[in-house]
């Protein structure tokens, strides 16, 4: 696997500043193709940040399920041969209704945006 998570607030702020934002019905994406030096020296190709607020759902179980779904979706997308060699960072912020939407529809929407903009 060539995915690692964004670890601290500084990394999130850096990607927010450098990245391009895409607003969809069920999520917001921030994709940064031009990465700073600290990311380029890493052995990983993809850096993933997930922000699931308490506003989305009060229960931690549901928020953790959303995070698991997002990580699984990203594994599927990154294992695609056209994305493996590219270094990029992405922050995914789910919106209301994310937990009810069909997994295949989420996969389609997320992969469409990522593959088009990388």
Swiss-Prot record:
Task: Point out the signal peptide segment.
Answer: none
One Pfam family, please name it.
Ribonuclease_P
Q: Which PROSITE patterns match?
A: RIBONUCLEASE_P
Q: Which GO terms describe its biological process?
A: tRNA 5'-leader removal
Q: Which GO terms describe its molecular function?
A: 3'-tRNA processing endoribonuclease activity; ribonuclease P activity; tRNA binding
Domain of life of the organism encoding this protein: Bacteria
Stated name of the protein: Ribonuclease P protein component
What organism is listed for this UniProt entry?
Rickettsia typhi (strain ATCC VR-144 / Wilmington)
State the gene name recorded for this protein.
rnpA
